[in-house]
UniProtKB/Swiss-Prot annotation:
Changing V24F: In Palmerston North; O(2) affinity up; unstable. Changing L89P: In Santa Ana; unstable. This is Hemoglobin subunit beta. Changing Q40E: In Vaasa; unstable.
Length: 147
């Protein structure tokens, strides 16, 4: 559960309505893989991830980034039940994929940076603070099965 004021919730949903999930998803996942290269080990089947250009241009990275942001969109629709919304994904990432839960926090922070880059002045400090709450809540929900 994420505790947002009505103003924060409105700001998050208003901005999210303008997000191009295809573009932002691929960019966020790509930047994660470039900035934190150890995360690439979970994506060995994606082919060439040898350079930043290869990562950012990789169609499998873009497609998976879109999928990730699709799940994030579902979370935004269920902010009062993030653990329930992400229970299946938490179980998958914990039991089958063995993803370090710290990676969820890292991806959330990268997503905030990508949103700031895309929206510039519209991504005000209050909007950023609200998004930081949301990505922290999503990361905690995804890490839930690890506890």
């Amino acid at each position: 559960m994420v505790h947002l004021t009505p103003e924060e919730k409105s700001a998050v949903t208003a901005l999210w309505g303008k997000v191009n999930v295809d573009e932002v998803g691929g960019e966020a996942l790509g930047r994660l893989l470039v900035v934190y290269p150890w995360t690439q080990r979970f994506f060995e089947s994606f082919g060439d991830l040898s350079t930043p250009d290869a990562v950012m241009g990789n169609p499998k990275v873009k497609a998976h980034g879109k999928k990730v942001l699709g799940a994030f969109s579902d979370g935004l629709a269920h902010l009062d039940n993030l653990k329930g919304t992400f229970a299946t994904l938490s179980e998958l990432h914990c039991d089958k994929l063995h993803v370090d839960p710290e990676n969820f926090r890292l991806l959330g922070n990268v997503l905030v940076c990508v949103l700031a880059h895309h929206f510039g002045k519209e991504f005000t400090p209050p909007v950023q603070a609200a998004y930081q709450k949301v990505v922290a809540g999503v990361a905690n929900a995804l890490a839930h099965k690890y506890h």
